[in-house]
């Protein structure tokens, strides 16, 4: 039920994306007073949701009553995620729909989650095989854009947002400025 609730409350049909958060009471400083949604699409929040949704099906029997709804959500997620894949690099932006906006940056953890989601969903047959090309572009982009070999031969993943959230201490207001500052 939580998966369907979040899809119903955070999905934006104009962009095909899911907002970072939703406040039922619509009282949080970041919440839209009409919808309760946060003001932006943070890629890592979408990535965590996508990974969770695709993983849940591993524990859900094929005849489970709500399985078709989950499959619809997975296909909706795939469509939205691929729509915002950066064409040159194959990875995704920190603020998903704000490509090339000054200050926005290509972000590794969200891109990794999106690649995981797309690969698993294709491999399990949850989404059409045509999404495999986007998953491969994303994987190759991860390697080219974010993996750095250190002088000692170890590897580092770069361009990872340290932390972001909504509400609480400080000005965690979900604004574009907040996300690019993290």
Task: Give names to the regions the model predicted.
Residues 1, 48-66, 112-127, 182:
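Well-ordered alpha-helical scaffold segments within catalytic/enzyme domains
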Residues 2-19, 23-29, 71-89, 134-152:
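Long, well-ordered core segments of solenoidal/helical folds
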Residues 3-7, 47, 54, 132, ...:
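Extracellular glycan-targeting catalytic surfaces
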Residues 12-16, 59-66, 86-92, 124-129, ...:
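Surface-exposed helix-capping loop/turn segments at secondary-structure junctions
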Residues 25-39, 93-103, 174-181:
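Acidic/His metal-coordination segments adjacent to aromatic residues that form catalytic metal sites
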Residues 34-48, 66-73, 106:
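Short, contiguous, pocket-lining structural segments
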Residues 50-99, 103:
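Oxyanion-binding "anion nests"
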Residues 103-106, 110, 115, 121-182:
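CBM-like carbohydrate-recognition segments
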């Amino acid at each position: 039920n939580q998966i369907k609730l979040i899809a119903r409350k955070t999905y934006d049909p104009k962009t095909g994306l899911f907002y970072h958060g939703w406040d039922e009471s619509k009282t949080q400083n970041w919440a839209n007073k009409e919808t309760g949604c946060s003001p932006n699409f943070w890629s890592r929040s979408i990535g965590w949701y996508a990974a969770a949704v695709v993983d849940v099906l591993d524990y859900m029997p094929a005849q489970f009553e709500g399985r078709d709804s989950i499959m619809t959500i997975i296909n909706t997620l795939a469509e939205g995620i691929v729509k915002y894949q950066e064409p040159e690099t194959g990875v995704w932006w920190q603020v998903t729909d704000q490509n090339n906006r000054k200050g926005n940056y290509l972000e590794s953890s969200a891109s990794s989650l999106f690649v995981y989601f797309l690969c698993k969903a294709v491999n399990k047959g949850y989404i059409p095989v045509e999404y495999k090309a986007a998953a491969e572009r994303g994987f190759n982009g991860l390697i080219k854009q974010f993996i750095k070999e250190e002088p000692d031969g170890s590897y580092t993943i770069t361009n990872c947002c340290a932390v972001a959230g909504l509400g609480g201490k400080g000005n965690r207001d979900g604004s574009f400025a907040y996300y690019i500052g993290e």
